């Protein structure tokens, strides 16, 4: 079996897709729609204020993920460096653009800080759980994240393409390269380790969801300065 064939990443994908609603994805099995974030992105009514908070909180998580794999002495983290999916630098440029347009950039307000701290803890003691978050956070941005970017651009930004939705090279191949790397890292895992990784999926969705909800927050503050 080659790394391009079936691997553990396929199991991760199946578990994560089940946690979507049918409205969000064809494979979705989540039946209860608790709020707007559980609906198709095309039906969202985003706000600039909320979107800026989303970008700020997301950058904290990307900062943490990139720092962990860059600084760690553990050899398996080296496989996750320079994937081409890194977003921290691009988000920084986008936030600078918003600032140049007269928008106040909010400070971190909780979810991103909490998630980054949790990832730092996991990375030192629980590789299977960390890999779950690494996979879900990056892959979500290339799928639903791009739809969010398109919706926000069309409704709020006069169709401006932000840097965090641009990748160097063909995205399909970049994603396949990361799938191969994760399959390589997980190749020697026991079934118990794999199950532990999969069981972390729901928690990764909760952390991401806490950040995602900012996009739909009321436009009460943070307008042009």
Q: Where does each model-flagged region fall?
A:
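Metal- and O2-centered redox machinery and metal/ROS homeostasis
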Residues: 1-225
């Amino acid at each position: 079996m080659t790394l391009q064939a079936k691997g553990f990443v396929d199991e991760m994908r199946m578990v994560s897709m089940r946690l979507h609603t049918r409205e969000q994805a064809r494979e979705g099995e989540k039946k209860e729609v608790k709020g707007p974030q559980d609906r198709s992105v095309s039906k969202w009514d985003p706000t600039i204020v909320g979107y800026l908070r989303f970008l700020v909180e997301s950058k904290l998580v990307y900062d943490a993920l990139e720092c962990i794999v860059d600084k760690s002495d553990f050899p398996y983290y080296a496989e996750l460096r320079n994937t081409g999916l890194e977003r921290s630098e691009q988000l920084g440029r986008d936030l600078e653009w918003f600032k140049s347009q007269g928008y106040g950039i909010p400070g971190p307000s909780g979810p991103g800080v909490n998630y980054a701290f949790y990832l730092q803890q996991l990375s030192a003691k629980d590789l299977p759980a960390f890999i779950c978050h690494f996979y879900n956070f990056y892959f979500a941005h290339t799928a639903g994240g791009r739809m969010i970017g398109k919706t926000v651009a069309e409704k709020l930004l006069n169709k401006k393409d932000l840097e965090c939705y641009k990748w160097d090279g063909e995205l399909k191949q970049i994603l396949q390269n990361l799938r191969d790397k994760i399959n390589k890292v997980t190749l020697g895992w026991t079934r118990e380790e794999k199950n532990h990784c999969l069981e972390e999926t729901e928690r990764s969705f909760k952390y991401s969801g806490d950040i995602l909800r900012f996009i739909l927050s009321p436009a009460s503050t943070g307008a042009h300065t």
